[in-house]
């Protein structure tokens, strides 16, 4: 029997960093997704949005306060935007075939997790369009097999190289170890 697993559907950004208005990112592949593009194309902001909605504090996003996530281009200088919001849509899937794209969405499994950043530096989580605590969001995701305490979710820029070097370093230690 095939197991159910969670899959990101689109990620929706509202007034988040370089994204004014509403922007939809995705959909994401069920097994593996990466964010690639030229310098300055917003890759880091997409990852920051994911980190934000999954509970990272402003300092972890290289910011002093959460209100710095709110889009602030010159176009909004006279009338600053009051909030930024990131919403991640999930659904559960069941593999149906041999191919990577052969799956069915489990009926009724769709849910949205959101986090809102306000100008007063407060933030609010939502689980299924209802206000929630971070603890409730983390418990829900944990029940679906997504562990937010695991530092491998997601793997960030620079970490891929570090991970690949671990194997090289261990191999060098092995080959350079004295033999008995």
Model-based region annotation:
Residues 1-9:
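Charged, amphipathic alpha-helical linker segments immediately N-terminal to NTP-binding catalytic cores
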Residues 8-180:
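Gly/Lys-enriched N-terminal cap/neck module of very large, oligomeric protein machines
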């Amino acid at each position: 029997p095939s197991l159910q697993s969670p899959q990101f559907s689109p990620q929706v950004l509202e007034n988040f960093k370089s994204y004014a208005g509403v922007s939809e990112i995705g959909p994401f592949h069920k097994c593996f997704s990466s964010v690639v593009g030229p310098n300055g194309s917003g890759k880091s902001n997409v990852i920051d949005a994911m980190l934000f909605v999954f509970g990272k504090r402003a300092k972890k996003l290289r910011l002093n306060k959460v209100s710095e996530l709110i889009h602030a281009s010159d176009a909004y200088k006279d009338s600053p935007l009051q909030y930024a919001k990131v919403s991640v849509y999930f659904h559960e899937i069941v593999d149906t075939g041999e191919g990577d794209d052969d799956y069915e969405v489990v009926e009724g499994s769709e849910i949205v997790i959101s986090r809102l950043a306000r100008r007063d530096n407060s933030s609010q989580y939502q689980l299924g369009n209802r206000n929630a605590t971070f603890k409730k969001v983390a418990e829900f995701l944990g029940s679906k097999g997504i562990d937010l305490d695991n530092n491998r979710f997601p793997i960030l820029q620079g970490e891929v190289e570090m991970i690949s070097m671990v194997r090289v370093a261990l191999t060098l230690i092995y080959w350079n170890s004295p033999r008995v």
